[in-house]
Amino acid sequence: MNQKRCTKKWTAAKRRRQSMTVSESRYRADKTERPGGIRRKYFVIASAQDGMPLEGMMVIPSRPRAVLQIAHGMCEHKERYLPFMRYMAERGYLCVIHDHRGHGASRREAVSADADKVLGKKQDIPAGLGYFGKDGGRFLVRDLHQITRIIKKQYPGLPYFMMGHSMGSLAVRCYLKKYDRELDGLIVCGCPGKNPMAPLGSALIQMLQKMKDPHSRSILADGIFANMFDRPFRAEKLIHAWICSDHTVVEKYNKDPLCNFTFTLNGYESLLWLMRSTYDRKGWEVRNPNLPILFVSGEDDPCLGGRKKLLQAVRHLKRRGYDRVSFRLYPGMRHEILNEKGRFRVYHDIAYFSRVKQEDM
């Protein structure tokens, strides 16, 4: 009798896991990650906003006890988070991430004659990278929520955490404005400091788009919004040294065509929308004021701009009405704290935060 019950439960769980294949998305074959029964799955859905294909990846433990949804940063892709996702899956977290629009495999081929050109010179950039589509920033946030609803439907009742890194940290805070009731905890990683020049930057991008095309790429825009972070590390003579103190990580990033590319003007317009919306005082519904929120950043991250900027970001959420906001700064670490040599300290802190918040529920 007990064996029959177990068989029925196992069959029901299997059907639940497989149902997304039929109703919501297209999966690739499972890939076994570790002997403990951890599996990796890829899926593709169409964005409910404009049909943009979104490719996602799940790392699933044998017995999930919570969900962690991850929003990656600018000019990178979901596979870079596999080591962290495996670490969390080994501790019972079902981890899900998708390539944001205009990143990784979530892109349409460019449609403009000026696409993928920088000042008239053709770049070796995979078509569609860095192009978000019309209303890209807002749609990116809604894409995140679409994934949330799919996962909650397939794995109902599990505590649900979200983490965003860099541009993703802007996206998850924009998500918070409307969808905070979906979450049981939020981790804000590699937070960009508030930039008072963002409105001026938006005006510049709009002017460039009138002169050129939303698909076009601009060295001027890239220099203003991205390359400036390398200035404190010029002595290291390594492009993108600002992202990590481990040069092996940086060199791998530089060789990855899905990372080392120039945003389109449309991409920068979408990024600046996320920045403005994140730090805007308007539009916050705050339906879950007791939501635990943890900021984690590297002390040497030039994108953050120092401890003062981090405290400003923390205060911003507290003033919007969130009561349980905390932070951790990691000495000697730069922007990508999940890839630093001391990354397991960060992994541990995130896992501990999530576990403690589950126990408080």
Locations of regions flagged by a protein language model:
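N-terminal cap/lid segment of alpha/beta-hydrolase-fold proteins
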Residues: T21-P61
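Active-site glycine-rich loops that stabilize anionic/oxyanionic intermediates
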Residues: R65, H72-E76, S166, E299-D300
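Conserved alpha/beta-hydrolase
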Residues: M85-D124
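Alpha/beta-hydrolase active-site loop
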Residues: Y131-K152
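Alpha/beta-hydrolase fold nucleophile elbow
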Residues: Y155-S166
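Alpha/beta-hydrolase-fold enzymes
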Residues: V172-L258
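Short beta-strand/loop motif that positions the catalytic acidic residue
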Residues: F295-S297
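Catalytic active-site module of serine/aspartate enzymes centered on a nucleophile-bearing elbow/loop
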Residues: R320, R324-M361
